[in-house]
Amino acid sequence: VDIMHQVDIIEDVAIAYGYNNIEPLWRELPTTGEAKPDQHLINVARDLMVGLGYQETLNTTLTNSETLFTKMNMPNSPLIELANPKVITMTCIRNWLLPSLMEFLSVNQSVEFPQKIFELGKVTLLDHTKETKTRDENWLAAATAHPNANFSEIKSTLDSFMVNFGVEWQIKESSNPSFIEGRVGS
């Protein structure tokens, strides 16, 4: 059964009736469409990353706690879980992007190096101040994989990215269980 949402039922009805039999209804009032205010910034960020030699990946927002925490050596933290997941690989909504990139690299190990990838996508965070108790944010993550990959390479990417947006920044040593101690900055 391929019914995960109300839209799936509507799609099945449309298929049964026949898409070619559906007459379009045109609005009487002219309307103009435009991108959301942050979409221009997102497009510029994507163009910058491509210009820096990265390929964009598009991963699903649904994932599982093993990918988010266990495989990333992170302690479990609160996240949004699906009430009735259909598959064990999609039981929650991602709250950060890096696990998706690592999974992408993992299944593409046979692809020729270097692999330089990024994702600019939505993550969903718990936010009890909101009516829905959640907040969607656009995040950017990048990864590079090849025998000579190092901190300087990814830092120079970040430097170029920030300079193009006119942002002054500096990196400070930090720690994260997903990375080797002493090789993490934020």
Q: What are the roles of these predicted feature ranges?
A:
Residues 1-115:
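Extended, well-folded interaction surfaces typified by the phenylalanyl-tRNA synthetase beta subunit core
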Residues 2, 6, 59, 129-136, ...:
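A carboxyl-terminal module marker
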Residues 14, 100, 142, 185-186:
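Small-side-chain structural scaffolding
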Residues 16-27, 35, 78-83, 121-148:
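Residues forming anionic-ligand binding surfaces in small-molecule and nucleic-acid pockets
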Residues 45, 120, 158-161:
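Hydrophobic alpha-helical packing residues
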Residues 66-68, 87-88, 102-106, 119-130, ...:
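Glycine-rich, charged/polar anion/phosphate-binding loops
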Residues 76-78, 97, 114-119, 136-139, ...:
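A generic structural signal for well-ordered coil/turn residues at beta-strand boundaries
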